[in-house]
Structures are given as structure tokens and as C-alpha cells.
Amino acid sequence: MTIFIHGFGSSGQGSKANLLRDYFKSIDRPFIAPSLSYIPKLAITTLEELIESYNKVNLIGSSLGGYYAIYLSEKYNLKSVLINPATNSVQTLKRAISLTGYAPNFYDNSSFEWRESHLEMLKEYNRDRIESNRYLLLLQKGDNVLDYRDAVAKIPNATMVIEDGGTHQFEGIERHFNIIEEFLEVNNN
């Protein structure tokens, strides 16, 4: 089973999730992309329950989903693909606490309350420098939210694809589906 973990303010129905869902369906491999709570502890609990429900699991995490995937990969010894991952979510998402205290939900343009207590929860899931080679990093230097060099420094032994240009959403992710499949060895599960 491959589980896609979406980013902050996104959902399991986002564009990357849908592209990946269609790809995994085309190769007849199990895939889920749950829509997770914005509350970190609830999101992690949901993901832990899913991981513990399946025999063999791989993760694909994007942005905040990459941060969660690092924590879960280290806890459960899983392979993960990280797409422009947030490696220091506490610092990055501190910016999301606006004057109103609300952050946007990109699925339906609603908003949700994002507070300091949520940042405190995120701290529980931080992992320092990762020496494992169980990771594939897909990074675009043009990411306007995160500095790709932070992920390179945090997970120096990862397999890496680093592209010039691009965006935080990672333009052209479908060009890398074969690399993702090969790295996760989904055909051998």
C-alpha cells in the first residue's frame, strides 16, 4: 500500500494526489490519499492507524506531508518519497499564523484556525539529521515556500532529483512517476 500525505491546507483530493491516484490505478497497485486533519496530532494518529492496518506500506509526502512522512518512516522503518518536503515545519508554519489566526484550505477556499498549540504539536514529530537511504527527494529549486537545500542537508544519504526552476507544488510531477515506482519497488510488493 502506498499512502500519499498531502501538505498544509491541502487534501487527499489535491492535484498531486489525483495524479498519483490515477497512476497507481493504471499500474494496478494499492494507493490511498486520505484527507487529513489540520491538527497535527490527529493527522499523525490517522496515518499511524493506516500504516498499522497494512502489511507493507510506502509513503509519499508533499510539503508538510513530507515532514510527517519523515517521522513515520523513522518510526516504522518505511521507504518514503518526499516532494519539496518541509523539513522544519514549526519554523515554516509559524508564518501561517496570520493576524486573524486563520489559514486557507486550498480544497474549498474555506479557512481553519491555526494556532501556537498546533506548532507545539509539530515539535513532537521533528527528527534531526537523517542518515538513512530509505528516502527519495524530489526537489525544485524554484520552490518559493521552502529552501530545497534544507532537505538536502537533513537527509544527505537520500536518492535525490533536484531540478532548476519549478514551484512549491512541484511542476511536472508525472515526469517522475517511473522513478517513484522504481524507488518504492511497488511492483515487488
Where are these regions (language model features)?
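Short hydrophobic segments within beta-strands
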Residues: 4-8, 60, 83, 138-140
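Short active-site oxyanion
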Residues: 55-58, 134-136
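Active-site signature of alpha/beta-hydrolase-fold catalytic machinery across serine-
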Residues: 71, 75
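Gly/Ala-rich beta-loop-alpha elbow adjacent to hydrolase catalytic centers
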Residues: 60-69
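The alpha/beta-hydrolase serine catalytic core
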Residues: 79-189
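Active-site catalytic motif of lipid deacylating hydrolases and related acyltransferases
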Residues: 1-54
